[in-house]
Amino acid sequence: MARLLLLTNSSSASADVMPALGLLQHDVKILPIEASVLVEPPVVDCLLIDARRDLPAAKSFTKLITSTGVDVPIMAITTEGGLSAINADWGIADVILDTAGPAEVDARIRIVIGKDAITQLANNP
């Protein structure tokens, strides 16, 4: 079970942002997309950024996160139409559609967390 932080400006539950999250056993904490979250971020394995509606704001926030030294993988949640706007400049580990099923969501979370763990071990032998 992974510890996830979902950053969203939606007032709904995580299952409304990405329905598959509601079916998985991960521990999901939800906070607003605000810079103040980065002052004392909770200990998590992965950040999920809600990029479904405001792509420019989501991109700016992912760049802010990477510039502050937060050292966990970031996944952007977007719609199919938003995929065309996302590129390497965002500084994210992965992107996933908000309509992805539970198996895909779980696999992608495990992969980005696993890759991050391997990178951490390689950088700190």
Predicted regions, residues:
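As written
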Residues: 88-93
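Short, Lys/Arg-enriched segments at the junction into DNA-binding effector domains
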Residues: 114-125
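Extreme N-terminal starter segment of soluble prokaryotic enzymes
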Residues: 1-5
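Conserved phosphotransfer microenvironments
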Residues: 10-16, 22-85
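C-terminal output helix
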Residues: 100-109, 113
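Detector for Asparagine
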Residues: 9, 87, 123-124
